A protein has these predicted regions:
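Short, compact, well-ordered microdomains
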Residues: 112-113
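Compact, glycine/acidic-enriched structural inserts
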Residues: 120-138
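Short acidic-glycine loop/turn motifs at beta-strand connectors
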Residues: 106-108
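Short, surface-exposed beta-strand/loop "edge" segments at domain boundaries and coil↔beta transitions
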Residues: 65-66, 100-104, 118-125
Length: 138
């Protein structure tokens, strides 16, 4: 993890869940196959979920400030799949923007954002680029 993310966790521990075990991460990998990038797995070991800047980062654990019903990567991904906003099995919802649009890990490790208008845009090359952007925006 980059030092600025570690500094945020040290300064605002209530914004970060505890890291999770490799067995918990493996359960996620088993369900979502190629969508759980190595960078995202590294983040989950550091924090099972977080709020960085104004963005939730969904993991396998919840942060108290998150929505009580949609607060883990599995719950949020299932919600957007069920709503038909993302194609089932192709994306992993790791965050949402201020309009409630999903921000997802793609099969190639890039991070894409979907709009309610049906558009998909690749915004970051990888997960670390996304969380660095979140930290810089805070």
């Amino acid at each position: 993890m980059k030092s600025n993310i570690i500094d945020l966790k040290n300064s605002y521990p209530f914004m970060f869940a505890e890291g999770v075990s490799q067995s918990e991460i493996q359960k996620l990998v088993d369900v979502y196959h190629g969508l759980v990038s190595s960078q995202y797995q590294e983040f989950l070991k550091f924090s099972g979920g977080a709020i960085i800047g104004a963005y939730p980062l969904y993991g396998v654990s919840s942060v108290e400030l998150m929505d009580a019903h949609f607060n883990t990567v599995s719950k949020v991904t299932n919600k957007y799949e069920d709503d038909g906003m993302i194609e089932k099995g192709r994306f992993l919802v790791i965050s949402e923007n201020h309009a409630g649009d999903p921000i997802c890990l793609n099969m190639d490790g890039s991070v894409v954002e979907f709009s309610h208008d049906g558009f998909q845009e690749k915004l970051w090359e990888d997960f670390n680029g996304f969380i660095e952007w979140c930290a810089d925006a805070s």
